[in-house]
Amino acid sequence: KMLDGAANAETAGNLIKNVWYNTIYEKRDTTTDKYTMKSGRFVEDFNDALGNLFSDEEFQKNISEIQDNQDEVTFYLKQLKNPPKEYEEAYTVLKTYYESYLSMTKMVINPTGSLQSFSDDFNNLDTETVDAYEKMKLYLN
């Protein structure tokens, strides 16, 4: 579940970055033009483009799925409190993975900062989440 949520957040986060960037630098792209352009011209404010993205029915559905995934993952993680001694190390690694996943999904649901800070923070969290998942795989059968 966490991997699915992280993958969806990665896709959404990359789209947010691209919409933001393409609006500022007036870069045409078939994926982002419907958010960054109006009547064949770029919107003047990147906030308008991001508003267009977050108003898009399909994108709203994706964000809603990410939120539902967060809720489900959090529920399951709470069930794992106080693991037996032999699983404490795996639980610690799982918690690290969860914290990276949660930070990344929250960032996508509510992007803040500048394009540069969002991009840097998102890329760092994306890498942290992948690294934490790789460590977690050591404990999976």
Regions found by a protein language model. Give the residues of each.
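C-terminal amphipathic alpha-helix
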Residues: 1-53, 86-141
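Amphipathic, heptad-repeat alpha-helical segments
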Residues: 63-85
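Mid-length scaffold segments of soluble, non-membrane domains
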Residues: 52-68
